[in-house]
Regions:
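Conserved HGGG/HGGXW glycine-rich cap/lid loop of the alpha/beta-hydrolase fold
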Residues: 25-92
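Conserved acidic catalytic loop of the alpha/beta-hydrolase fold
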Residues: 106-124
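Conserved hydrolase catalytic core segment
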Residues: 122-161
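Flexible "cap/lid" loop of the alpha/beta hydrolase fold
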Residues: 150-179
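Conserved alpha/beta-hydrolase catalytic His-Asp/Glu region
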Residues: 182-224
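Short beta-strand/loop motif that positions the catalytic acidic residue
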Residues: 242, 248-250
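Acidic catalytic loop of the alpha/beta-hydrolase fold
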Residues: 253-257
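Catalytic active-site module of serine/aspartate enzymes centered on a nucleophile-bearing elbow/loop
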Residues: 272-311
């Protein structure tokens, strides 16, 4: 009976999938659970369905969880600007001022804030992963009254000296072209084999990635989002102004954004807390769900115990 009740409670917290227009962009989102709002921001090319469902369900037992597709991914709006070539991306990473992307990370942060405001929410706990961590950092630095707490997972500060991928990962990504739909799943799994930690579960990843690819496939959007990252400035100085309680999480086996990215992020944000998980790479292994969710809840509680945020 207890198991049946638990299963029923998890099914009931999956409540609403909808779309709203903000900043001239249609944003697909999903709301689960009840409680204080918590916004999940996905990484490069990821969709809202790329958050492990069990992780979302467990969070939704404590928060009103809002996850969404960034612009140029999933079921949100796609840019009509042609995707950059591989050479243009390399050039942009070497010299950010040489490119003019259709949008930057700042625009993506404004999308997230616009979604909150469209949902009639003044603020939320902000949790971002990888590129989503970069977006979350910009929200916390630029909109302190909208940020109850910040959790930046396997991300960096934009300082190109910190969190650099390993040479092997760089070489592997550089060798790849843009896969067609029939190849995309195998290419995704091959990448996770490179960047995932020892606790990464290939079967779970394959099932989740296959479902996301069936939902939407936009390789050009991945290139444009990559260009947005390359064109966005170092956030280190801005992060020194963050006042929200902050948790920084990184896997010690991350080869895509190496652990120095998390260390630099924690060093830049006053009074932040840093957790480095062994056996975790650039992934969210189920084995860390309990510890990660507990840490997120603890950080959120710091917000409730803190003095009022600046106006």
């Amino acid at each position: 009976l207890q198991q049946c009740v638990s299963t029923l409670s998890l099914s009931l917290i999956r409540s609403l999938v909808a779309q709203v227009q903000v900043n001239g962009v249609d944003i697909e989102y999903e709301i689960s659970g009840s409680g204080e709002p918590l916004l999940l921001i996905m990484g490069l090319g990821g969709q809202l369905t790329d958050w492990p469902q069990e992780f979302v369900d467990r969070l939704a037992q404590h928060f009103q969880v809002i996850r969404y597709d960034n612009r140029d991914s999933g079921l949100s709006s796609y840019s009509t600007v042609p995707a950059p070539t591989r050479w243009e991306l390399i050039k942009g990473n070497l010299k950010p001022s040489s490119i003019e992307p259709p949008y930057r990370l700042r625009d993506m942060a404004d999308d997230a804030l616009g979604l909150l405001y469209a949902l009639d929410l003044d603020d939320a706990h902000i949790v971002g992963i990888s590129m989503g961590g970069m977006i979350a950092q910009l929200i916390a630095a630029g909109a302190p009254t909208s940020t109850r707490s910040l959790c930046s997972i396997m991300s960096n500060t934009g300082d190109r000296r910190a969190g650099r991928p390993t040479p092997g990962v760089v070489a592997s990504i550089a060798r790849r072209g843009q896969p067609d739909r029939s190849e995309a799943l195998d290419v995704t799994i091959e990448l996770f084999r490179l960047v995932g930690g020892r606790d990464w579960d290939e079967h779970e990843q394959r099932v989740r990635s296959a479902a996301s690819l069936d939902r939407a496939y936009n390789p050009a959007g991945v290139l444009r989002q990559s260009q947005a990252i390359a064109a966005s400035p170092d956030r280190t100085q801005a992060l020194r102004q963050v006042t929200a309680p902050t948790l920084v999480v990184h896997g010690l086996e991350d080869t895509l954004v190496r652990p120095s990215g998390g260390v630099a992020t924690a060093a830049a944000i006053p009074e932040s807390r840093l957790i480095m998980f062994p056996r975790m790479g650039h992934d969210l292994p189920r084995s860390r769900d309990h510890e990660l969710i507990t840490a997120i809840r603890t950080n959120a509680a710091r917000a409730n115990a803190a003095p009022s945020r600046p106006s």
